[in-house]
Swiss-Prot record:
Gene: minC
Signal peptide segment: none
Name of the protein: Probable septum site-determining protein MinC
Role noted for this protein: Cell division inhibitor that blocks the formation of polar Z ring septums. Rapidly oscillates between the poles of the cell to destabilize FtsZ filaments that have formed before they mature into polar Z rings. Prevents FtsZ polymerization.
Xref: Pfam families: MinC_C, MinC_N_1
Transmembrane segments: none
Subunit comment: Interacts with MinD and FtsZ.
Keywords: Cell cycle, Cell division, Septation
Amino acid sequence: MKKNVQIKGTKDGISIFLSDKASILELQQELTQLLADQKQNPYSGEKLEVQVQIGNRLFSEEEEREISTIIHKNSQMKISAFYSNVMSKDEAKKWKENDQIFSMATIIRSGQVVQVPGDFLLIGDVNPGGQIRSNGNVFVLGNIKGIIHAGFEGNENAVVAGKFLYPSQVRIAGKVYGFDSEDYKEVTETDLFSAFVNDAGEIVIDGIHKIRKIRPEISNFQGGR
């Protein structure tokens, strides 16, 4: 008979696998018995971080606490995280929002902050003092003189595309690039650029054509809002 609870060493460290076919009560009982058996649990005396893999199910906060309590009471192991193959409704909603392209046709004026959860397309200008914050990529069909913050929640793979003019500033995740030179006042109408984080962890400004090369997945974007 297949065990509902197993402790295994993986490439990511030690994991406790809990069958998604068993009830929470069965898991609690088998986990307690397994951890209490020194012969079956060679890790009982070690202070290790473990991952708890719960398969195709979700645990409530209370169920996670109950499993955590059993592990802490019967071993020296510390849970680093619970991992599931499925996502909650809130996680699915956030994922869907982050996967969308939001668009506006307007001018972002001084003091204005526009924030979106996914990619953002602006048809218009960003004036000095105006700011765009996006969890994804930002594309501006207009003049950029304000602040563009792509990958707002830490996504360094995000890119920015548009016509950067003095005194614009580009931020990608935690990186910052400021256009503090008067030279950018003379940029022509055809000067569209891309900004991205390179392998050295620095923001690079290059031609618009570079986007497809460094982020080929962007050409597959569909949808809008």
